[in-house]
Amino acid sequence: VGFKAGVKDYKLTYYTPDYETKDTDILAAFRVTPQPGVPPEEAGAAVAAESSTGTWTTVWTDGLTSLDRYKGRCYHIEPVVGEENQYIAYVAYPLDLFEEGSVTNMFTSIVGNVFGFKALRALRLEDLRIPVAYVKTFQGPPHGIQVERDKLNKYGRPLLGCTIKPKLGLSAKNYGRAVYECLRGGLDFTKDDENVNSQPFMRWRDRFLFCAEAINKAQAETGEIKGHYLNATAGTCEEMMKRAVFARELGVPIVMHDYLTGGFTANTSLAHYCRDNGLLLHIHRAMHAVIDRQKNHGIHFRVLAKALRMSGGDHIHAGTVVGKLEGEREITLGFVDLLRDDFIEKDRSRGIYFTQDWVSLPGVLPVASGGIHVWHMPALTEIFGDDSVLQFGGGTLGHPWGNAPGAVANRVALEACVQARNEGRDLAREGNEIIREACKWSPELAAACEVWKAIKFEF
């Protein structure tokens, strides 16, 4: 036939509505907003082309390979209800386009280039279906939910955490003191803030030592296993690993990483180290809102959550749901299930565009954190269930009597909610009543309830 130079429409090659998706394909759902005058088929095909084998003009080297084998295909387009000129474009990518076990490569391919494309006004990646064959190339979370419970010997309830505040400015010794008080009072974990790395007022090594001392002391006094998320995030991968190694030498149970600012490559290395060395890995999602907050451009958090489960982490922050809109609650619970469960059915009402089978990849505990306090406990227990970490920063340290009583208040509230639920009571309806009853035999909880009573909780 010979080589025919020139520019041709993407849709001639990359829009294939008759394509039957394969079990090994990576499937993507994009929310596409084309520029005025660009037909949706062309926009969808452009996304498929630019994120796989295509470029803007025909090149003679196309003849040296089999495009049919390697090209991404836009196989379905549907208009978004209630939005003008916005479509969901479904794209299938052949498995061979991706390096095994590399979240970094997967993202570079799928979202690396196409988001700046001129034919599109905006583009958002809403969901990915990761095929079983690709899932199996990832180690995933270092340990997962069941192994974590066995390590901690804690069952049948959510775990409790607290971020140490003020996040910047405390000396290492005072920081360790705050950690000890919270753990001693009844929390399971305390946490380094995401921006606590190694600053002039508190170098990482000093912090690690004082926190380890706090953990050991609290464990000895309570007879429970305790942890503090030691943030190993650093300016280089080597420095990050050095901090993780030191944490292991101290014998602490868990370290922490900011996976978006630190990057997927660093995160996956750390996750492998954590599995090999028995460390749990807590993941903070600093920077996520830069990527996921705009509703028609960027990447939805459920995709970032799936990517984290592949890269590896035992906990990840996932919003609180509390006091938010009803719809957001369903969407949040959708990606919470994607983090924890082994098999998730497609359910558009919860934002889940594809059925996802994780084939026994360990699950991740969702962490609810941010602006929550004791009055929220019944709702949180009901919404998140046992497999979660509930984190109260100000809701612990803001207690009028101090950190330890703040921790006591949270633990009492949690145990009361779990007991009430196990007795068959309705937490959504009777939540406030359950907390009030518990106040009668816990002055610490009563004091906490008094401080935050004005912050109402609407279901």
From Swiss-Prot:
Cofactor comment text: Binds 1 Mg(2+) ion per subunit.
Residues that coordinate or bind Mg(2+): 191, 193-194
A GO-annotated cellular component: chloroplast
Pfam families for this protein: RuBisCO_large, RuBisCO_large_N
Primary residence: plastid
Enzyme class: lyase
BP-aspect Gene Ontology terms: photorespiration; reductive pentose-phosphate cycle
Compartments, record wording: Plastid, Chloroplast
Catalytic activity from the UniProt record: 2 (2R)-3-phosphoglycerate + 2 H(+) = D-ribulose 1,5-bisphosphate + CO2 + H2O; D-ribulose 1,5-bisphosphate + O2 = 2-phosphoglycolate + (2R)-3-phosphoglycerate + 2 H(+)
Active-site feature positions: 165, 284
EC code: 4.1.1.39
Marked site: Transition state stabilizer: 324
Highest rank taxon of the organism: Eukaryota
Cofactor(s) in the UniProt record: Mg(2+)
Keyword Isomerase (UniProt): no
Binding site for substrate: 113, 163, 167, 285, 317, 369
Sorted UniProt keywords: Calvin cycle, Carbon dioxide fixation, Chloroplast, Disulfide bond, Lyase, Magnesium, Metal-binding, Methylation, Monooxygenase, Oxidoreductase, Photorespiration, Photosynthesis, Plastid
Coiled-coil residue spans: none
MF terms (GO), sorted A to Z: magnesium ion binding; monooxygenase activity; ribulose-bisphosphate carboxylase activity
Note: The basic functional RuBisCO is composed of a large chain homodimer in a 'head-to-tail' conformation. In form I RuBisCO this homodimer is arranged in a barrel-like tetramer with the small subunits forming a tetrameric 'cap' on each end of the 'barrel'.
Subunit organization: Heterohexadecamer of 8 large chains and 8 small chains; disulfide-linked. The disulfide link is formed within the large subunit homodimers.
HAMAP family, A to Z: RuBisCO_L_type1
Function, in words: RuBisCO catalyzes two reactions: the carboxylation of D-ribulose 1,5-bisphosphate, the primary event in carbon dioxide fixation, as well as the oxidative fragmentation of the pentose substrate in the photorespiration process. Both reactions occur simultaneously and in competition at the same active site.
Protein family per UniProt: Belongs to the RuBisCO large chain family. Type I subfamily.
Protein's UniProt name: Ribulose bisphosphate carboxylase large chain
